[in-house]
From Swiss-Prot:
Top-rank taxon: Bacteria
Role according to the record: F(1)F(0) ATP synthase produces ATP from ADP in the presence of a proton or sodium gradient. F-type ATPases consist of two structural domains, F(1) containing the extramembraneous catalytic core and F(0) containing the membrane proton channel, linked together by a central stalk and a peripheral stalk. During catalysis, ATP synthesis in the catalytic domain of F(1) is coupled via a rotary mechanism of the central stalk subunits to proton translocation. Component of the F(0) channel, it forms part of the peripheral stalk, linking F(1) to F(0).
Gene: atpF
Name of the protein in its database record: ATP synthase subunit b
Entry similarity comment: Belongs to the ATPase B chain family.
Species of provenance: Mycobacterium marinum (strain ATCC BAA-535 / M)
């Protein structure tokens, strides 16, 4: 370091003694600044750049891993969505089948109830017809049995003569 100082001082004295002051010609200051620059560059290149590069590489690796995870997640989501759609389609088909079966069973129950009601109506009508026939037969027998007495009573009321006596009969 002592040599550098002496060079700088010598260059400064030479300039004062009447040397040319051309800034394009390198002097001792230039070499001293160049040496300091190279030392600082070496220190930065040795101690600063490698940790920064390491952090940047780790960040790039993390970004790449995140992208891969996102892609994998998207594929898993697409597969799950496809499975969901497939399951929903199967469920819709099964629900449609259950609904159709329920409708068919409902129609069958309604038809059975209708047939049972028609059968009850037919038996009720048959019983009513039989009862009416029995009552008609009973009324007919009663009328046949009482027709003579009723006609005599009617003739008595209309004619005013007792037609039930044996003299009127002859």
């Amino acid at each position: 370091m002592d040599d550098v100082n002496s060079i700088v001082l010598a260059a400064g004295q030479a300039a004062e003694e009447g040397g040319t002051n051309n800034f394009l010609v390198p002097n001792g200051t230039f070499f001293f600044v160049l040496a300091i620059f190279l030392v600082v560059l070496a220190v930065i290149g040795t101690f600063v750049v490698p940790p920064i590069l390491k952090v940047l590489r780790e960040r790039d690796a993390m970004v790449a891993k995140t992208l891969a995870d996102n892609k994998k997640s998207a594929e898993q989501f697409a597969a799950a969505q496809a499975d969901y759609e497939k399951a929903m389609a199967e469920a819709r088909v099964q629900a449609s089948s259950y609904r159709d079966n329920a409708r068919a069973e409902g129609r069958k129950v309604v038809e059975d109830a209708r047939a049972h009601a028609e059968q009850e109506v037919a038996s009720t009508l048959q019983q009513a017809n039989e009862q009416l026939k029995r009552e008609r037969d009973a009324v007919e027998l009663d009328l046949r049995a009482n027709v003579g007495a009723m006609s005599a009573t009617l003739a008595n009321r209309i004619v005013g003569v007792d037609v039930t006596t044996p003299a009127a009969a002859g």
